Amino acid sequence: MRKISSYILLWMLGCLNASAASYTFDINKGILFSWEYDDLVGVYTTKGTRIKHWALAASDDGKTSSFSSYGWSLVEDKKYYLYSPYNSSYFVNDIPITELPISFEGQMQMENNSLTHLAAYDYMMGEGNTVGSSADFTLNHLCSVLRIEFVSPKSATYTSIVLKTSNDVFCREATMNLETQSLSATSRENHVELGLANIAVDEGETLVAYMVVAPVDLSGRDVSLTIISDNGEETNLDVQARELKAGKLYLINTTNNEGKSLSSKHRASSLTEPYISTSDIPIDRDSELIVTGIRQSKHNKAQDDGAVYTLSGIRAKQSSANGIIIRNGKKSLTNRGRN
């Protein structure tokens, strides 16, 4: 049988997702993306038959790369569905494209200010129709990302961060439906947790962490963010919450405008929601979320239980601040192979 080499060119404009992607944060541009060698995406046909999972060979700058595969080529006038990050179990277990399972459990950040773990949880999908021998995909981000900046009041080693409210509104597990381009929760909890791999932070230094959450409307709810150290000490932040939207980056910090640590006498600007942009043009101002209080406590965990987290009311006004651009754009897939 003759091998067919199909080369698929993927043009990136700062998209967030890939299973082996590289991420960086820029205060003016948001989260910037770069492909890594041998990254994978998954592709299905209209009927849900897996065609091929393409291996990515990144270009020098990581923005323009080629997917290559053997034994197939795009079929004219056919619809294709693409998802990322790649999951081999979908094919092994013959899971329908309407019920692809995803999970928000097990998020673990290994180092301070590291974004590496985002690649496994920043779920995206898109669809495209072939015109001639090419197909264009616009991939949609399904989740929100929180950037948490916490000025440590003393030298400590941190083990986890928990975002919590009083009801089971946070998506724990869900399914992706590539045909409807939607996400549906299959189980919910009242919190979402980011594990920290014993990250040591000196007094006065900043712990920077990233957490992925499914879109959720927290408007009017009591919401807390709990930062836990290895000796059981907890710092509980009251957060004025609102709707967390897909494809948005939110910033939570515990410093005021003078850069001082948050205390009972200081309030912190936080949780800026930017709009997705495909250019470097500054975006309009948008409302922000406020950290309204901070409390120190110590919780002695039982050996086999989960932590108990403190809740308190929301007490702050909304204000506006400059947004942070997440650069995103269309992924253009062009079949350059021949039958």
Task: Describe the function of each predicted region.
Residues 7-15:
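Bacterial N-terminal signal peptides
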Residues 132, 146-208:
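Short helix-loop boundary/capping segments
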Residues 288-339:
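C-terminal outer-membrane/trafficking sorting elements
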Residues 47-55, 169-173, 232-238, 316:
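Surface-exposed loop/edge segments in extracytoplasmic proteins
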Residues 21-155, 206-209, 238, 245-248, ...:
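Short, low-hydrophobicity acidic/polar segments
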Residues 75-79, 218-222, 322:
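Extracellular Ig-like/FN3 beta-sandwich strand-entry sites
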Residues 1-4:
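Positively charged n-region of N-terminal signal peptides that target proteins for export
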